[in-house]
């Protein structure tokens, strides 16, 4: 059980930021704010969400993309991070698992995820 002051602080943090609803298998485009000296810029990272873990303020999600020379790049982001400028859901994937770590072993077309049709 958490201290009530900690709980009040966490509740206030959760109210400040809204996130789109997404799950593992969805393709996301994340805008990450990067500060270099006095300048700030937004760098975009696009990939598949392969895991969501935790809850409340401590909730995180992992996004995987295939970079240059077919090298996989995974980044873990806190849900309520100040560095996340924007989160956009590009595609809704149809998967039957909560954690898609098996995509690490797949290459090419085997790593594709079916899209939900409406």
UniProtKB/Swiss-Prot annotation:
InterPro entries per UniProt: Ribosomal_bL19 (IPR001857), Ribosomal_bL19_CS (IPR018257), Ribosomal_bL19_sf (IPR038657), Translation_prot_SH3-like_sf (IPR008991)
Gene Ontology MF, one: structural constituent of ribosome
UniProt entry tagged with the keyword Ribonucleoprotein: yes
Entry keyword set: Ribonucleoprotein, Ribosomal protein
Entry keyword Lipid metabolism: no
Disulfide bonds: none
One GO term of the biological process aspect: translation
GO cellular component, one term: cytosolic large ribosomal subunit
Family annotation (Pfam families): Ribosomal_L19
Family: Belongs to the bacterial ribosomal protein bL19 family.
Primary role: This protein is located at the 30S-50S ribosomal subunit interface and may play a role in the structure and function of the aminoacyl-tRNA binding site.
Classification via HAMAP family: Ribosomal_bL19
The protein's name: Large ribosomal subunit protein bL19
Protein species of origin: Helicobacter pylori (strain P12)
Taxonomic classification: Bacteria, Pseudomonadati, Campylobacterota, Epsilonproteobacteria, Campylobacterales
């Amino acid at each position: 059980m958490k201290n009530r002051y900690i709980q009040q602080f966490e509740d206030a943090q959760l109210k400040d930021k809204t996130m789109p609803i997404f799950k593992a298998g969805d393709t996301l485009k994340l805008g990450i704010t990067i500060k270099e000296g006095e300048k700030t810029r937004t760098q975009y990272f696009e990939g598949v969400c392969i895991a969501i873990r935790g809850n409340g303020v401590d909730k995180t999600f992992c996004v995987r993309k295939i970079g240059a020379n077919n090298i996989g790049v995974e980044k873990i982001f806190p849900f309520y991070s100040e560095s996340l400028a924007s989160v956009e859901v590009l595609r809704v994937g149809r998967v039957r698992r909560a954690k898609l770590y098996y995509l690490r072993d797949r290459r090419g077309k085997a790593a594709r995820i079916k899209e939900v049709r409406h």
